[in-house]
């Protein structure tokens, strides 16, 4: 059973993996939270490291046979510390949500008050949504954006002093603006609250120095290792607060507080992604992510589409389709017919349900990682406009689909299809 070949042993799964690979290779991916990992990361994640249980931390495991595992985790931590210029790192969280849970569990007690960004205004489920642990275990309130589509800091300050949360949460999953981390920390200090920031979406831009870094102001920062960082799907907790008690609480909250054994094949892959992010070309990658995003917004505005806040300062932006008389769900499904993948997304004060939405979210990390040139990004953006202006024109959609496929062949992800 050990030395089996996937194709021969389980052809059903093998065929589906091949189909998914072909799908990824032949579609343009504009989902802001997705990216492509390197072949080195794929190799690490498919390695024998997946076999090893390693409960505990370096030098203090609950299983024998972890001497090599310790070295791998040590490398991951060392690289993360260098990348983020921090003194505390925990590379064990399985995901961003797990990382966030661990931070909450370390710094809060059940029913403590938290204040995070409204999910419908660009926040994340784990920032206080009532359908998530963060809104069930804790008493959550939310701040949002103003009429200009930017964070309403006056409301944030008012709500902070009104409810006096134990923690203020910064970060987002669908917000295209710049966050004033310094001012948010000032508000937190005024009410003696923790300031916790989730940089999952903007982590790559931050380490490249082209988006404000919250580490100087936040007590704790969490992130995923995919998205703009371009690594494996996983979580990370970092801090420069200098409080050893907080560091100890965070470690205990990850293990044994919320997880058992770490995923060592993923931690090895994280280490590789940190090495990749330390290379000079990573800065150019992030620079293009921002440049492509801004360029696309300009085209959408020129084509009379409504962009939330009218601009972007990161890798993503939201298109308000209310005036186009098409829902986000319909738009994303129609664009998929043309081999263009986006996701439906709620917009501030959306009249539609989260399952339908009035908007779509567009992001540039994957097309930049793939190496697609700005010339084709401009064409793709205009094609999106053409399709959304004539969603029932199946002939046009079919023609665009063929053009997209040609571009995909020109820019393969891993190899020729």
Swiss-Prot record:
Enzyme Commission number(s) of this protein: 2.1.2.1
InterPro entries to which the protein is assigned, alphabetical: PyrdxlP-dep_Trfase, PyrdxlP-dep_Trfase_major, PyrdxlP-dep_Trfase_small, Ser_HO-MeTrfase, Ser_HO-MeTrfase-like, Ser_HO-MeTrfase_PLP_BS, SHMT-like_dom
Pfam family membership, one: SHMT
Reactions it catalyzes: (6R)-5,10-methylene-5,6,7,8-tetrahydrofolate + glycine + H2O = (6S)-5,6,7,8-tetrahydrofolate + L-serine
GO MF assignments: glycine hydroxymethyltransferase activity; pyridoxal phosphate binding
Pathway noted in the entry: One-carbon metabolism; tetrahydrofolate interconversion; Amino-acid biosynthesis; glycine biosynthesis; glycine from L-serine: step 1/1
GO CC terms: cytosol
Gene3D superfamilies reported for this sequence: Aspartate Aminotransferase, domain 1, Type I PLP-dependent aspartate aminotransferase-like (Major domain)
Region forming the signal peptide: none
Gene Ontology terms: biological process: glycine biosynthetic process from serine; tetrahydrofolate interconversion
Protein name: Serine hydroxymethyltransferase
Gene, per the UniProt record: glyA
